[in-house]
Curated annotation (Swiss-Prot):
It comes from Cryptococcus neoformans var. neoformans serotype D (strain JEC21 / ATCC MYA-565). This is Polyadenylation factor subunit 2. Transmembrane segments: none annotated. Pfam families: WD40. Required for 3'-end cleavage and polyadenylation of pre-mRNAs. Also involved in chromosome segregation where it has a role in chromosome attachment to the mitotic spindle. The keyword Nucleus applies. GO terms for biological process: chromosome segregation; mRNA 3'-end processing. Residues 460-469, 494-504, 678-712 have a biased composition (Gly residues). SUPFAM superfamilies: WD40 repeat-like. Its main location: nucleus. WD repeats lie at residues 131-170, 173-213, 214-253, 256-295, 298-337, 340-380, 387-426. Residues 565-592 have a biased composition (Basic and acidic residues). Keywords: Chromosome partition, mRNA processing, Nucleus, Repeat, WD repeat.
Length: 712
């Protein structure tokens, strides 16, 4: 069979084209490729954003997207309405946990009328800077509370979003500095005044509908009447003028001030006007007759601002003397003088819900909160010392009362909200377990009370009675927390692992009234005393008196003090600390042989503490270490069970009298051991404890009584 002929050129090279027509039906890949996947939408959006930034800026600089910060602009109204609609839970208030997600459980101030402190807006949220570098003279929330309107020294209105606080629009409305503007009570009109004395009308959409010359000089303040039919203005011409809004005509001019009138305010419900002037006078006017009803002469400087309280009973005035004066119109007397500012006070604002809460701003940039329900209403309850970098000119609360806005000379308007649940480092039991959360709280309180000299809060130490190796976490919130966990293992036979006492209940060497800075730490307490070995078994340090009595102190009238648990002893404070089970004297009971045993219980006192048998005195201080502090407790009454007798006490012998000698034959005594008189088990470093003769009542702080063989 003849092979097919391959077409070739004159040089013998094959011509293009398959020799076999069937070769066109076979596809042979030149290289292997992965199937194409569409790009992620997020990647496409980011690329589109970067392209738009490049086109707008003309360069290739990469800019980061910064999300807007939004607070609880609804003030918890939705949550509150839901709770009100549920039957039986209208008084229910959800708990706020330390988690940012719990912000949904915030309720509006109107739901918390009984607690004004929940409406203090001291948490900074956002700073809005004017587009034009000009001081912000006035800040006011719009009637719908969705936006904030500010006026500056260049005669411009600026709108800011009330939720994200970003800039929305700016409008030139005056030819001079805007000094005041206010919305009517029904929210349908806006009246503004400037430094040139011009008064203008605006719609809620900031459309100028009318303007006229109201004062010959600067107009400083504007206030509406309760029915929105009239408004009142004041100016540097020394006049207070009442205007008809519909006719835009002056109805009455109130003259009586001898200098510039800086502020004016109409009573919220009645026909009464208050004004303050540079002549240091506060005047009350009747708008129907134009007469001066009363004049207050308390101030000794210029009056910068005056405001009626929302209930209309009080009026607050402030000026260059840096104090705020409260007057009660029912008596026309000064009620209180609020101090706390260092410079002149420029603005005052009452809380719209809590009428006892007042906020003020001064020329130093400080914002102070005052509460008339406070035990000391003359001092601020909250101070924002650096709220602004320059003088604060205006303050305005959100109608719900959960956000405060402040305008300043530093060209900014700053927003403040209520304190929110903390985030970032959760200290709850769901993140750190219960012991971890308690440990974190303990470390926080330790650092607060001890500062940089705080010992480690998790230091393990020997405790009375062999408590095992499990770490005991102190209870947070009590006093003397650090002393409860400060522990250092002392002695060669330390076996205990528990804490030395509950916080505030028997902390070592902490006396009543001792400040945290004076509490002895393990590094400053010195080496143990003569009973170091017994001390290490029953507790690592001698327990001094604390701010609260210990459990042993409270129960020692009824029971012998129980030290730790050793091998076989119930009352011994350490290894073989007391008697055996057949000889322990727990609180002065009869022993099996019929003899009366006197422990630290109600069995009655012995005729006196023999040397080395335990007494009520403190042990001698070790050399080169500070002596034990004197006791702050009063001396115990005479003949009280469990306490030592008086120095000259002598009970006549007879039936029922305490024995004058040992009920058993004393064991043979060796050479005298030069032992110091031991202290009581709970108060001394000696190994002897209590008043039991054969192991009675070993102390929790030291070894208990006699050993099992009857010797010390």
């Amino acid at each position: 069979m003849t092979a097919p002929t391959v077409p070739a050129d004159q040089h013998g090279h094959p011509l293009p084209g398959p020799a076999d027509p069937a070769a066109n039906d076979t596809w042979r890949p030149s290289r292997y490729r992965e199937p194409l996947h569409p790009d992620n939408e997020e990647v496409l959006e980011q690329a589109a954003y970067q392209a738009a930034v490049t086109r707008s800026s003309g360069d290739d600089r990469k800019r980061k997207i910064k999300p807007r910060r939004t607070v609880d602009y609804q003030g918890g109204v939705q949550k509150w309405r839901m709770l009100n609609k549920l039957k039986g839970v209208h008084e229910f208030r959800p708990a706020i946990h330390p988690n940012p997600s719990d912000i949904v459980n915030f309720l509006p101030p109107v739901a918390l009328r009984s607690n004004p402190s929940t409406s203090i807006c001291d948490y900074w949220v956002h700073t809005s800077i004017n587009k034009e570098r000009s001081p912000t003279r006035v800040v006011r929330w719009t009637p719908d509370a969705r936006r904030l309107l500010t006026g500056n020294d260049k005669g411009q209105f600026t709108l800011w979003n009330g939720a994200s606080f970003n800039y929305e629009s700016i409008t030139q409305v005056h030819d001079d500095s805007i000094r005041s503007f206010t919305y009517s009570h029904n929210g349908q009109a806006l009246v503004s005044a400037d430094k040139g004395g011009t008064i203008k009308y605006f719609t809620p959409h900031l459309t100028n509908i009318h303007g006229f010359q109201g004062h010959r000089e600067a107009c400083h303040d504007v206030s509406w009447s309760p029915n929105d039919e009239r408004f009142v203005t004041c100016g540097d011409d020394g006049l207070v003028k009442i205007w008809s809004y519909r006719e835009a005509k002056e109805e009455r001019s109130l003259s009586g001030h001898g200098w510039d009138v800086r502020c004016v305010d109409w009573h919220p419900t009645k026909g009464l006007i208050v004004s303050g002037s540079k002549d240091m006078l506060v005047k009350f006017w009747d708008p129907r007759t134009g007469k001066d009803l009363s004049t207050l002469h308390s101030s000794k400087s210029t009056i910068n601002t005056c405001r009626w309280s929302p209930d209309g009973h009080l009026v607050a005035t402030a000026g260059q003397d840096s104090v705020i004066r409260l007057f009660d119109i029912r008596t026309f007397r000064e009620l209180e003088v609020l101090k706390g500012h260092e410079k002149e006070v420029n603005c005052i604002e009452w809380h719209p819900i809590h009428h006892s809460l007042l906020v003020s701003g001064d020329a130093l940039g400080t914002i102070n909160y005052f509460s008339l329900l406070s035990p000391t209403p003359s001092t601020p309850i909250t101070t924002l010392s650096a709220a602004h970098e320059d003088a604060v000119f205006s303050l305005s609360f959100h109608p719900l009362g959960h956000i405060l806005c402040s305008g300043s000379k530093d060209f900014t308007a700053r927003f403040w909200c209520r304190a929110r649940p903390p985030g970032g480092q959760e200290f709850d039991k769901w993140h750190l377990t219960e012991e971890g959360a308690a440990q974190k709280e303990l470390e926080r309180i330790t650092k607060r009370e001890w500062g940089t000299n705080a010992p480690p809060a998790n230091a393990a130490g020997g405790g009375g009675g062999g408590g095992g190796d499990k770490q005991q976490v102190a209870l947070p919130g009590l006093s003397n927390l650090v002393a409860a966990v400060n522990s250092v293992k002392t002695g060669p036979t330390t076996t205990g692992g528990g804490p030395s006492g509950l916080p505030g209940l028997g902390a070592p060497n902490v006396h009543a009234g001792t400040p945290p800075s004076r509490v002895s730490t393990p590094s400053s307490m010195g080496p143990p005393g003569p009973g170091a070995q017994g001390q290490a078994q029953g507790g690592q340090f001698p327990r001094g008196r604390s701010a609260l009595p210990s459990q042993n102190d409270m129960l020692r009238h009824n029971h012998g003090s129980r030290g730790g648990f050793a091998d076989r002893d119930r009352n011994g404070g350490g290894d073989r600390g007391g008697m055996d089970r057949d000889r322990d004297s727990r609180g002065g009971r009869q022993d099996p042989r019929g003899n009366q045993m006197y422990g630290r219980g109600p069995g009655g006192p012995p005729p006196g503490p023999p040397p080395g048998q335990g007494g009520y005195n403190y042990p001698p201080a070790p050399p080169n270490y500070p002596p034990y502090p004197p006791s702050s407790y009063p001396p115990p009454p005479n003949n009280q069970p469990g306490y030592p007798p008086a120095p000259n006490y002598a009970m006549p012998p007879g039936p029922g009298a305490p024995p004058q000698s040992y009920p058993y034959n004393r064991p043979p005594q060796g050479p005298p051991q030069n032992n110091n008189p031991g202290g009581q088990g709970n108060y001394g470093a000696s190994a002897s404890g209590g008043y039991g003769q054969y192991g009675g009542g070993g102390g929790g702080g030291g070894g208990g009584g006699y050993g099992r063989d009857g010797r010390r």
